Amino acid sequence: MNRSAYRYISGRVLYHLRTEGVDWFREFRPHISGNSFWSLGGFNESYYVHIDSHFAFENGAEIHLPGWNLTGEGLDAPFQIRDEGDLPDGGRGPIIIPVGTYNNQELLFVANTNRSAPLSVSAGVTFGDFYSGTRSSPYGSVSYRFRDRLTTSVSMNYFDVKLDEGSFTTSLVRLTGSYSFTPRIYLQANLQYNDDSKNLGSNIRLGWLDTAGTGLFIVYNDTEFLGDIDPLGFRSGPRQRQLVIKYTKLFNLRG
């Protein structure tokens, strides 16, 4: 969220506890972090406190539990969180959260296998209070790496939100990949689909590196609307297509 004219405070405390006498367990990392934003008039716009414990195993796997988040959102104007959702009266329409201060709590659990292995899996879930209601958001990802040339990953996030003003669900699916032809030439791709907006976005980048991060970069961006009619009344089809070619060169002017 972009902010202007605000006061801000943040902090973090982390402790590493090694267990030398246990072969299969590496370390325990309890920690707490947080931040808070105020307007110049003293209104608390938001705060976030995160309390968690990470259990790191010798085989590279980790478990984070139980994470506990304390969150707060201050709204000095109504906030439309959804263009269309299920309203309490059984109809469909925009979901608008009224003015107020919302203090919430949520729990989270995260686990992953060894991320440096050729094949790794990550999964987690967050659930708890959200504005005037509740939210649950499980997610998962699978990553594959072949030597130092190929890396791929597929992930999915799901959000189930139930508020006094209405309810909705959203899914986000993402596929990423990177292939290195040589240490200086690579191809990267990022595909993302949001079932809320019905948009399929893609970003493809070809890089041919020179010294100090310079070189040739070719980037193609594309957004396709896969629904019937979007909120502006347009039918399915392309929404954005962009091709960017950039070349930079570093010169030594001192001879």
For the regions a protein language model found, what residue spans apply to each?
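Exposed, low-structure sequence patches enriched in small/polar residues
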Residues: 1-255
